Amino acid sequence: MIKIKVPATSANIGPGFDSLGLALDLFLTLEIHEATTTWQVIHEEPDLPHDITHFIVQAALTLTSNMQPHRLVVKSDIPLARGLGSSSAALLAGLTMANILADLNLSPKEILKQATMLEGHPDNVAPALLGGAISAYYDGHQVYNSSFHIPENIIFTVFIPDYELKTAEARNALPDDFPFKKSIAGSAISNTLIAALANDDWQTAKQLIEKDQFHEQQRHHLVPHLLEIRHIAHQHDVLGTYLSGAGPTVITMAPENEAKILLPALTHLTTSGRTIQCHLNRSGLTITKEE
């Protein structure tokens, strides 16, 4: 049995729209069992198929059709349509499965390029594959990526609402055009945030994480709890609160001691959901073989 384990991811980190992302210690696990005559996908999601039409198998087939079907078991801690990279994790699991079963010998760089091409942007797939926190850009031909350090004591307090928010719906909330001056401001904020994060300048990062210009203001009507959580978090010494990916999940970054205090403060939000705390996953996608 081959086991592929892919972490959840949180994209944007505030102003790093479609470019910044980090991996969290929630996981999708794909187990590849015995060969079969047709694809069998065993999972507990009521609305997903159990055959060749499952997204993981379809992702694998984008690389090659020269694969013997197998019995697959999918287990996931990553909630669907919540802004935590569930589709990116499934995509990478499928591509990695194809790489193994068809002996394609693709490098991680080649897997990343294929995943980014299918996803359209690298901010989820890059940290899911490589682990840690990553800044990345895709020009339509090549993926450029570089990691940056986040200290061990930083905890991610993750509020996951009970409702789904499809990425397409969240994308539709964004304008087709953007004012030039606001674009410059957004770019400058993002650039400075990356430099601050790369240099462990948390005082500067703290002032910039909540200054996004590109998407949070346009999506706040879809995620009213963002401002509510941000207001509560400001009463503690946190680094910042941001919309994870397209939402509706909201994440607050804070040192461990402050995170412990923050958690019970988020128990009575007006939006129903659950709050968990995660660490940065530094290993990314892993493959193990078991007898």
Swiss-Prot record:
Subcellular location, record wording: Cytoplasm
Biological processes per GO annotation: threonine biosynthetic process
GO molecular function, one term: homoserine kinase activity
Class in the EC hierarchy, top level: transferase
Chief location: cytoplasm
Known pathway: Amino-acid biosynthesis; L-threonine biosynthesis; L-threonine from L-aspartate: step 4/5
UniProt EC number: 2.7.1.39
Keywords: Amino-acid biosynthesis, ATP-binding, Cytoplasm, Kinase, Nucleotide-binding, Threonine biosynthesis, Transferase
SUPFAM superfamilies referenced in this protein's UniProt entry, alphabetically: GHMP Kinase, C-terminal domain (SSF55060), Ribosomal protein S5 domain 2-like (SSF54211)
Binding site for ATP: P79, L80, A81, R82, G83, L84, G85, S86, S87, S88, A89
GO CC annotation terms, alphabetical: cytoplasm
Catalysis performed (reactions): L-homoserine + ATP = O-phospho-L-homoserine + ADP + H(+)
InterPro entries: GHMP_kinase_C_dom, GHMP_kinase_C_sf, GHMP_kinase_N_dom, GHMP_knse_ATP-bd_CS, Homoserine_kinase, Ribosomal_Su5_D2-typ_SF, Ribsml_uS5_D2-typ_fold_subgr
Protein family: Belongs to the GHMP kinase family. Homoserine kinase subfamily.
Job of this protein: Catalyzes the ATP-dependent phosphorylation of L-homoserine to L-homoserine phosphate.
NCBIfam families: thrB
Name this polypeptide is given: Homoserine kinase
